[in-house]
Amino acid sequence: MEFLPLFHNLRGSRVLVVGGGEIALRKSRLIADAGAVLRVVAPEIEAQLSELVVQSGGEMILRGYSECDLDGCVLIIAATDDEPLNAQVSRDARLRCVPVNVVDAPALCTVIFPAIVDRSPLVIAVSSGGDAPVLARLIRAKLETWIPSSYGQLAGLAARFRNQVKGLFPNVQQRRAFWEEVFQGAIADRQLAGQGAEAERMLIAKIAGEPPPETGEVYLVGAGPGDPDLLTFRALRLMQQADVVLYDRLVAPTILDLCRRDAERVYVGKRRAEHAVPQEQINQQLVALAKQGKRVVRLKGGDPFIFGRGGEEIEELAAHGIPFQVVPGITAASGCAAYAGIPLTHRDHAQSVRFITGHLKNGTTDLPWSDLVAPAQTLVFYMGLIGLPVICEQLIRHGRSADTPAALVEQGTTVNQRVFTGTLANLPQLVAEHDVHAPTLVIIGEVVKLREKLAWFEGAQATL
């Protein structure tokens, strides 16, 4: 290990920055964020850096560098494009045994700046020892996506009770076990879900020795339209800590594979006129599993609150006092339209968009057809494949032109995506000609014409 990772408390200490340009500004921002007082030395200092110095309560010295500028400073930064000057600053600092960093010159440094993930008070530093800074930044970028910002709040919660826990458990092993339970259990879940007050209440109860609640928690997670890359970070995190996953037919296998490997998987999918598991039974199953103390992911295609019956499920959970979280997903209308190259709204073609269920009941649909034929709007029908002849017929009968552009998006956002475009008049015919199957989204409106020049994703299938 060439460099020993340390965290330096600079609050209120003076730091010398030699240089007044963009490089010096970048370093000075980090230093100022740590609460240091800046001393910047350069013949010219750019405006943003000047403001930063003033905000830190520091000083600007408008001249060339002098060895006496190091007086009273605990850290030295050489941030100029003058290599001999940078080398001189490094030598002077070393002679005084003051830590020095020379930008982009590891050989002249006694300290280097890592790539930083800031979730204060939790801070993560990644360094390549100056050998591959781009690689360190790429690793930092991955960590930024893996570690929610709420981890900082979780660390802050622990900090507020640290001394109290230390007094309760004088043995370090006991304290470690206590905090591991906190960070891996329901208290952390509440804090990460944005329920800080409840997390604090539970931590106080745990410190007081009260038995923890036996109830688990349910995560209602939107799996999006099919492409795993469209999952949210929170969805992925909760999927990977679930004990049980209840999933429906619209959840792609590639998404299901991202769940925790040893989680129990329960299929509760539904097909038209064939409910594998009645909705009421799904609701009861969620309650029963949570009462067993399990973390349950209810994984639903698209967004759980858009034609997903998510509202019914959490009503049941709320009635039984079961804690739950709702993680939105990209709904099929947004995802499939984007991957098909069809903007749902457009200044020249559509000023509004409607999401509509096309599900037939007793062979018909009970929809406000007169409203649906208004101009300058896009219609998106979910579950509309079986009822498509009725939908097209009713729209034309109520005044929508038979030549209105329309599209079918089958298995949108996946490698098996197929898109077929036509008009209201021939859309049902396209279904038969190309053997189109669910899940298929129906998009109706002038915006469909834009696909000819905006299509960008074709998947593995030909489109028409």
Swiss-Prot record:
Binding site for NAD(+): E22, I23, P43, E44
Listed pathway(s): Cofactor biosynthesis; adenosylcobalamin biosynthesis; precorrin-2 from uroporphyrinogen III: step 1/1; Cofactor biosynthesis; adenosylcobalamin biosynthesis; sirohydrochlorin from precorrin-2: step 1/1; Porphyrin-containing compound metabolism; siroheme biosynthesis; precorrin-2 from uroporphyrinogen III: step 1/1; Porphyrin-containing compound metabolism; siroheme biosynthesis; siroheme from sirohydrochlorin: step 1/1
Alphabetical list of SUPFAM superfamilies matching this protein: NAD(P)-binding Rossmann-fold domains, Siroheme synthase middle domains-like, Tetrapyrrole methylase
PROSITE patterns: SUMT_2 (PS00840)
Pfam families in alphabetical order: CysG_dimeriser, NAD_binding_7, Sirohm_synth_M, TP_methylase
Family recorded in the similarity comment: In the N-terminal section; belongs to the precorrin-2 dehydrogenase / sirohydrochlorin ferrochelatase family.
Name of the protein in its database record: Siroheme synthase
